[in-house]
Curated annotation (Swiss-Prot):
Main subcellular localisation: cytoplasm
Protein name per its UniProtKB record: ATP-dependent protease ATPase subunit HslU
Organism phylogeny: Bacteria, Bacillati, Bacillota, Bacilli, Lactobacillales
UniProt KW keywords: ATP-binding, Chaperone, Cytoplasm, Nucleotide-binding
Places the protein is found: Cytoplasm
Any single GO CC term annotated in Swiss-Prot or TrEMBL for this entry: HslUV protease complex
Family: Belongs to the ClpX chaperone family. HslU subfamily.
The keyword Signal is assigned to this record: no
Record organism: Lactobacillus leichmannii
Superkingdom to which the source organism belongs: Bacteria
Signal peptide positions on this chain: none
GO terms assigned for molecular function: ATP binding; ATP hydrolysis activity; peptidase activity; proteasome-activating activity
Length: 464
């Protein structure tokens, strides 16, 4: 199947993000170049590396939103990380290689989901057979075994995570007929609310050390989990819920995880995307203090990952040679040239995002799919309230957001969310208790609710 063209990718991004056409085009071209590269002979493919992108622009103009929407658009492993979460090797915190391990996990999740779809029909049939046996159990018979057989069975049972069983099941003709009847009812969906007791793998317990281990890039729980047997617990659930759990277990039995891991590593290495946000926060404007030195250390740790290296993951080695890296930052107190020269050179495509104008705010309020206004209209619809905004009111909201941004810290489109929350506070509070029918938000109402905020600079500071 042909990949989405750059124009199609930009059109999809336009549904959610206003303006910033240069950034959208750069991202779209970089993504489509992956498809172009895949059509070339292997000896040529090896020499074509992704052209990494550095996006710079004020906060709240769409850098992170572009990354978030990309994850929905592209059929490729995608992870978003924050540069500020990493620490230099030798310090407590996440090491930079953890972003590659996160990408490997995401690739496995995607491929696993695809493989589950292929065996879903078979898994459902097997789960239904199990449900029939549980709903109409056979006659239990005691097994008399010598001590050696009992010991062997106990060891096997413990390794499997279950308990000891000295019983076998005998199916009589009557039970067989009952099972046929139950199977027919299951197929017709007549037993969905019947309760059944099933054995499922016990969910892993929360580990208080887990967060610390995760910060240091160590996945001890998963490493130990693969070695130790899975413990099973009994749960009584409606048939509809029990089937979902049984189908999940059957799918895991039917797929080949060695193939999944191999495909996932290949996909992550050839088409993976890592978005590094807040990269401006690790620039070392002042190299004389220890904080500046530490930040430069993080940059130097990121450098070999972006240049191309091999990182060990629990699924196998993963090469970063052909992973696309997109970095973004506001660069309010620094500039891209404050990054170490070697790292600058690894992001050859530079895109500057524009600050938002009043007209941009108007479009952000109305145009995107599930825009802010559409979200509030849908929320109040749940209370039977029809919320309507006049064109003049929308224009005034945008004007106030722009003025507040100009008068205080410019936080871009994020300003709209807090202004709308302040504007609709009374409606949201009274909505569930009043039969209000249709409420129209006019320019006069907006001015009444928000004019004090614009005039009073002390109040403006609290509209974050």
């Amino acid at each position: 199947m042909r990949e989405k063209t750059p124009k199609q990718i930009v059109d999809l991004l336009d549904k959610y993000i206003v303006g910033q056409n240069e950034a959208k085009k750069s991202v779209a071209i970089a993504l489509y170049n992956r498809y172009r590269r895949a059509q070339l002979p292997e000896d040529v493919q090896k020499d074509i590396t992704p052209k990494n992108i550095l996006m710079a622009g004020p906060t709240g103009v769409g850098k992170t939103e572009i990354a978030r929407r990309l994850a929905d658009i592209v059929d490729a492993p995608f992870v978003k990380v924050e540069a500020t979460k990493f620490t230099e090797v030798g310090y407590v915190g996440r090491d930079v290689e953890s972003m590659v391990r996160d990408l490997a996990n995401e690739a496995v999740r995607i491929v696993e989901k695809e493989e589950f779809v292929k065996v879903e029909g078979q898994a459902i049939r097997q789960a239904n057979k199990t449900l029939v046996r549980l709903l109409v159990p056979g006659v239990k018979r005691n097994n008399r075994q010598n001590q050696m057989q009992q010991m062997q069975e106990m060891i096997q049972s413990l390794l499997a995570g279950g308990g000891m069983s000295e019983e076998t099941e005998e199916v009589t003709d009557e039970i067989r007929n009952q099972r046929l009847s139950v199977a027919e009812k299951l197929d017709r969906g007549l037993l969905e609310n019947e309760e059944v007791t099933i054995e499922v793998e016990q969910a892993p317990k929360a580990n208080p050390m887990g967060d610390m281990m995760g910060q240091m890039g160590m996945d001890m729980s998963s490493m130990l989990g693969d070695m130790l047997p899975k413990k099973k617990v009994k749960r009584t659930l409606p048939v509809s819920q029990a089937r979902k759990l049984l189908v999940q277990e059957e799918e895991k039995k039917l797929v080949n995880y060695d193939d999944i891991y191999q495909k996932a590593m290949d996909r992550a290495g050839q088409s993976g995307i890592i978005f590094i946000d807040e990269i401006d926060k690790i620039t070392a404007a002042d190299k004389r203090n220890s904080a500046g030195v530490s930040r430069e250390g993080v940059q130097r740790d990121i450098l070999p990952i972006v240049e191309g290296s091999t990182v060990s993951t629990k699924y196998g080695p993963l090469s970063t040679d052909h992973i696309l890296f997109i970095a973004a930052g506001a660069f309010a107190e620094s500039k891209p040239s404050d990054l170490i020269p070697e790292l600058q050179g690894r992001f050859p495509i530079r895109v500057e995002l524009d600050a938002l104008t009043k007209d941009d705010f108007v479009r952000i309020l109305k145009d995107p799919q599930n825009s802010l206004l559409k979200q509030y209209i849908a929320l109040l619809k749940a209370d039977g309230v029809d919320l309507v905004f006049t064109a003049e009111a929308v224009d005034k909201i945008a004007e106030i957001a722009f003025e507040v941004n100009q008068g205080t810290d410019n936080i871009g489109a994020r300003r709209l969310a807090t202004i709308l929350e302040k504007l609709l506070e009374e409606v949201l509070y009274e909505g569930p208790d009043m039969e209000m029918g249709q409420i129209t938000i006019t320019q006069a109402y907006v001015e009444q609710k928000l004019s004090d905020i614009v005039k009073n600079k002390d109040l403006t500071k609290f509209i974050l």
